[in-house]
Regions:
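An N-terminal amphipathic alpha-helical segment
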Residues: 1-40
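Short, flexible coil/linker elements and helix-boundary hinge sites characteristic
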Residues: 23-27, 64, 84
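Acidic, low-complexity, intrinsically disordered interaction modules
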Residues: 29-74
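Disordered, low-complexity tails and leader-like regions
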Residues: 1-4, 41-50, 79-81
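Polar/charged, Gly/Pro-rich intrinsically disordered segments
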Residues: 69-85
Length: 85
C-alpha cells in the first residue's frame, strides 16, 4: 500500500501544465485522490472541451503508469490512472 496523500509539487505542476487548458479561464486547480496505486483526478465540466487521448497518455507517462478510465459524475470528469511512482 502506498502511503502517499499528495504528489510532489513538481509532478503536480507538470500535470497541471497539461490539463489547465481544459479548465475554466483563470482556474488552475488540480484536484485528485490517491488510493493505493491509483489516482483519480476530478475536473469540472466547465468549458465543454474534453481532454484528448494524447494528453491522457502524457499524464500517464508523468505518473509512470497507465490510464484506467474516465467517468462523468455530478457535472465533473473523473480520470483514473494506475501509478508507478
Amino acid at each position: 500500500m502506498i502511503n502517499m496523500t499528495n504528489l510532489d509539487k513538481s509532478v503536480e505542476e507538470e500535470i497541471l501544465a497539461i490539463v489547465e487548458k481544459y479548465q475554466k479561464e483563470n482556474t488552475k486547480l488540480l484536484n485528485y485522490l490517491i488510493v493505493d496505486d491509483e489516482i483519480t483526478f476530478f475536473s469540472p465540466i466547465a468549458n465543454g472541451s474534453e481532454i484528448t487521448a494524447s494528453d491522457l497518455q502524457k499524464v500517464a507517462d508523468i505518473l509512470k503508469g497507465s490510464f484506467v478510465g474516465m467517468e462523468i459524475v455530478n457535472q465533473e470528469y473523473r480520470f483514473k490512472f494506475k501509478m508507478g511512482i
